[in-house]
Design a protein with these regions (language model features):
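Beta-strand-enriched, solvent-exposed domains that form extended recognition/catalytic surfaces
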Residues: 1-36
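Fold-level signature of zinc-dependent metallopeptidase catalytic domains
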Residues: 37-89, 104-114
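Extracellular/periplasmic catalytic domains that process cell-envelope and extracellular macromolecules
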Residues: 53-57, 94-97, 152-157, 174, ...
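Solvent-exposed loop/turn segments at secondary-structure junctions
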Residues: 67-70, 108-112, 166-170, 186-188, ...
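Short pre-active-site segment immediately N-terminal to the catalytic Zn-binding motif
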Residues: 73-76, 171-196
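Active-site-proximal segments of metallohydrolase catalytic domains
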Residues: 99-175
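Catalytic Zn2+-binding segment of zinc metalloproteases
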Residues: 196-212
């Protein structure tokens, strides 16, 4: 947001121990004549999907659309309303629904759909979203910060998720920046909420058998994210631990990993051959049946402990529960550590 008075802006990054250190700073005067004051690009009418109160007293969540033509605005609004309802089906968002205002904007695109470079598809869309970010075929991001900020500035917001007009599975979530999700994918109920969890509460991915575009330190420093730890004997969620649960907490890890590695081979083969998305949907459904049974019938299923395997690593990082929306596409919902983290953010913004 534009400051009302001169400010100093400091950019910080995390060091090897996940501690913030300043890397650059500059002074900004909002009256500086070099600041551009041209009109913002056309974003279309602001849609109030849910207005619970004054933006000063609520969490303001903005859903943006990318890759929708002017003729597809109705499609976007329908999908935006759908994902809003899906978000508020999940605890703790469900219990805090009235703490949220939800807005939507959809700048018209000249082309329908978004870029997917790995298959030769390139589109010029208002927000610039694209698959294949950082070489990961399912990672959807925009690197045009100014483009989406210019559109988002036409609405009240603290949090933003970009719905892409696409069916291929893909999305992304960056803490305190934005999240994305492919609106037409069959797993949108999981995908939209999972990616929003990254953006809204800084939740870590708890899965660790999928190919990812990041590399962790071999030293395994304590993660800054609230739902992963390198210290299973003294986890950051120790106040939530179930009585009598051993630490670290045993689970059918080897069986899960053996099955998951075979599943990942099938997944890569489908993408490598550019086979129909229906085949990926079928694979996801098959995997969900297996994982739901394995993770839901274990000795410590539903208990809070310290289960090894999280934050993209099979060893050295632990999650609070055996299953979670940040771990699988199952219907487990958010784990205890995630729920507490989400509620903490809601309390920061809602009065």
């Amino acid at each position: 947001p534009q400051p009302e008075a001169p400010v100093r802006i400091t950019v910080k990054k995390r060091d090897a121990k996940n501690v913030f250190v300043a890397v650059w700073s500059f002074d900004l005067d909002p009256k500086d004549p070099l600041i551009e004051r041209t009109p913002a690009p056309e974003a279309g009418a602001l849609i109030a999907l849910q207005k619970s109160g004054d933006p000063a007293d609520k969490v303001d969540f903005l859903i943006l659309g990318d890759g929708y033509t002017a003729a597809e605005r109705g499609k976007f609004e329908q999908q935006a309303r759908k994902v809003m309802e899906l978000l508020f089906e999940q605890t703790p968002f469900k219990e805090h629904r009235r703490d949220f205002n939800v807005w939507a904007l959809c700048p018209a695109s000249k082309e329908s759909g978004i870029s997917r470079p790995s298959t030769g598809v390139h589109k010029r869309t208002p927000l610039g979203t694209t698959y294949d970010a950082f070489g990961s075929e399912r990672y959807v991001l925009t690197f045009d910060n100014r483009a989406w900020r210019d559109i988002a500035a036409q609405a009240p917001y603290e949090f933003v998720e970009i719905l892409t007009n696409s069916e291929t599975y893909g999305g992304g979530g960056i803490h305190n920046l934005y999240s994305t999700a492919s609106a037409g994918n069959s797993t949108i109920g999981y995908l939209f909420v999972h990616e929003f969890g990254h953006h809204f509460a800084g939740l870590a991915d708890e899965y660790y058998t999928s190919d990812v575009a990041v590399t962790n330190s071999p030293d395994r420093p304590e993660p800054w994210e609230p739902n992963a730890t390198a210290d299973p004997l003294n986890p950051k969620w120790k106040a939530l631990l179930s009585p009598g649960v051993p630490l670290p907490t045993p689970w059918r890890k080897a069986e899960f990993e053996a099955h998951s590695h075979e599943y990942q081979k099938e997944r890569r083969a489908i993408r490598a051959a550019n086979r129909p998305e229906s085949e990926m949907d079928a694979l996801f459904a098959k995997e969900k049946v297996f994982e739901t049974k394995l993770l839901g019938t274990d000795a410590h299923s539903g208990k809070v402990g310290a289960f090894e395997g999280a934050n993209y690593e099979a060893k050295g990082y632990f999650r609070s529960q055996e299953d979670c929306l940040m771990f699988t596409r199952n219907d487990a919902g958010f784990c205890a550590a995630c729920r507490v983290a989400i509620e903490k953010v809601i309390r920061q913004y809602a009065k």
